[in-house]
């Protein structure tokens, strides 16, 4: 019982410290096409793991990758500042 409680506490601390900024940005990938919403897709696909980010990993492809070629890409597509910081 103690191990379970300790593991749950550890998971919540680690996930909060590592994912707060991602959660604040609603899992938005600044380089993703405007019509893509990683946040919405991950809300529906919860893996139940020890990770408040639900396993979301930002896209590895550079801005303007091979998907949705006609969509606007880049931080400015989501009105994100050039420095990449989240809007408050």
UniProtKB/Swiss-Prot annotation:
Membrane topology, as annotated: Lipid-anchor
Keyword Disulfide bond: yes
Keyword Signal included in the entry's annotation: yes
Annotated compartments: Cell outer membrane
GO biological process, alphabetically ordered: regulation of cell shape
Alphabetized Pfam families for the sequence: Chlam_OMP3
Keywords, alphabetical: Cell outer membrane, Cell shape, Disulfide bond, Lipoprotein, Membrane, Palmitate, Signal
InterPro entries noted in UniProt: Cys-rich_OMP3_Chlamydia (IPR003517)
Renumbered residue ranges of the record's region Disordered: 67-88
GO cellular component: cell outer membrane
Signal peptide span: 1-18
Cystines in this chain: none
Lipidated residue numbers (N-palmitoyl cysteine): 19
GO molecular function (one): extracellular matrix structural constituent
Lipidation (S-diacylglycerol cysteine): 19
Self-association and partners: Part of a disulfide cross-linked outer membrane complex (COMC) composed of the major outer membrane porin (MOMP), the small cysteine-rich protein (OmcA) and the large cysteine-rich periplasmic protein (OmcB).
Function: In elementary bodies (EBs, the infectious stage, which is able to survive outside the host cell) provides the structural integrity of the outer envelope through disulfide cross-links with the large cysteine-rich periplasmic protein and the major outer membrane porin. It has been described in publications as the Sarkosyl-insoluble COMC (Chlamydia outer membrane complex), and serves as the functional equivalent of peptidoglycan.
Protein name: Small cysteine-rich outer membrane protein OmcA
């Amino acid at each position: 019982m103690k191990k379970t409680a300790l593991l749950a506490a550890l998971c919540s601390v680690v996930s909060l410290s590592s994912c707060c900024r991602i959660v604040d940005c609603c899992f938005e990938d600044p380089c993703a096409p405007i019509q893509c919403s990683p946040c919405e897709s991950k809300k529906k696909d919860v893996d139940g793991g020890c990770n408040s980010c639900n396993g979301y990993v930002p896209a590895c492809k550079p801005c303007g990758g091979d998907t949705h070629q006609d969509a606007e890409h880049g931080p400015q597509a989501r009105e994100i500042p050039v420095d990449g910081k989240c809007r408050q």
